[in-house]
Every structure is written in structure tokens, then in C-alpha cells.
């Protein structure tokens, strides 16, 4: 299996978080910078990475490399929203992602917006519950995105055709 070469020119990069971190040693304190970056191709692929170095630019570069290594493909509905509602969790953070009609826009708080911009989603409603820590929220968002499945992949798993997956409202029987 060969690795697919990722074109750097087509990837968008968003710096989500930068922190100054300190390591206490015998002779005093050593300062460094920690960066968290989200990269995506705005066409259904996105990744996030963390980097640490003595300079901000070096930390950002390391974070971008880590994000490119962790890129994942997300199935999108009409290249603008997700196929179905989904919940993701990471520690005390919980996010709810809901599909939205065309023209709704990205209704999301904090670092989730950077993920959806890089992913190429135009219409989505996202709500974060619990922890608002940047790392936990991004991890919970990626957990939710991992749970997404397209109708085609669901049909393949069930050995059915795509049109057999969807239930028409006229076919639903109500027991009275």
C-alpha cells in the first residue's frame, strides 16, 4: 500500500492555540511554546496536531506536520454539511453536531469553527457541553466526525443497496 502524497499548497492551516510552557530545572526555568494547529483541504479531509518548541514558528511547524500525519476523510452531504446528527465525547467535553439546511452557515463555538472551516463544511450546527478546554473540544469533535457514515458505507456494511437504507414515511406502520 503506497502513501498518498499530500499537496501542501491546497491545505489550509488554522492556528487554534498557542501557550508558553515552562520546565523547571535545577538552574531555573526553561521556557518553550506549545501550538495546536488544524489543517484541511476544504474538501472533506481534516487533521489536528500539537507541537512544542523554543520558538513559536518552530512549534507551529511541528504542529502542522503532526496534523498532516493525522488527517482523516469525512463523508459530507452535498459537500456542505454532515449526513446525520452525531455526538462526540472526550473526557469532560461533549459536542453535538447537527446537520443544517443550505444557507444556515457554521454555527459553532470556539475551536470547532476552525475544524469545520478547514473541512469544507458550509452548513452545520454544533454545541459544546461540559469542558471548553481547546484540546478536549477538538478531540471530542474528531470523535464525532469519526462516527459519521455515508449512506453508501452503511449500505455496503449491511449488504444492501443505498435506496433500501432509507425508509419512506408512507412505509412506516403504526400499531394502534
UniProtKB/Swiss-Prot annotation:
GO cellular component, one term: small ribosomal subunit
Any GO BP: translation
Entry keyword set: Ribonucleoprotein, Ribosomal protein, RNA-binding, rRNA-binding
Ranges of residues in domain S5 DRBM: 11-74
Keyword Mitochondrion: no
Annotated SUPFAM superfamilies: dsRNA-binding domain-like, Ribosomal protein S5 domain 2-like
Protein family membership: Belongs to the universal ribosomal protein uS5 family.
Function field: With S4 and S12 plays an important role in translational accuracy.
Full protein name: Small ribosomal subunit protein uS5
Amino acid at each position: 500500500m503506497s502513501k498518498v502524497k499530500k499537496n501542501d499548497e491546497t491545505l489550509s492551516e488554522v492556528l487554534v492555540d498557542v501557550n508558553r510552557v515552562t520546565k523547571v530545572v535545577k538552574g531555573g526555568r526553561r521556557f518553550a511554546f506549545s501550538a495546536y494547529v488544524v489543517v484541511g483541504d476544504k474538501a472533506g479531509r481534516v487533521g489536528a496536531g500539537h507541537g512544542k518548541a523554543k520558538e513559536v514558528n518552530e512549534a507551529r511547524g511541528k504542529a502542522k506536520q503532526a496534523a498532516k500525519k493525522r488527517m482523516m476523510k469525512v463523508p459530507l452531504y452535498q459537500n456542505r454539511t454532515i449526513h446525520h446528527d452525531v455526538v462526540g465525547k472526550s473526557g469532560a467535553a461533549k459536542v453535538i453536531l447537527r446537520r443544517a439546511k443550505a444557507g444556515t452557515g457554521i454555527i459553532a463555538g470556539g475551536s470547532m469553527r476552525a475544524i469545520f472551516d478547514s473541512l469544507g463544511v458550509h452548513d452545520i450546527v454544533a454545541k459544546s457541553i461540559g469542558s471548553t478546554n481547546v484540546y478536549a473540544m477538538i478531540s471530542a469533535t474528531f470523535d464525532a466526525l469519526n462516527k459519521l457514515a455515508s449512506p453508501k458505507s452503511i449500505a455496503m456494511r449491511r449488504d444492501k443497496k443505498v435506496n433500501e437504507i432509507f425508509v419512506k414515511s408512507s412505509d412506516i406502520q403504526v400499531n394502534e
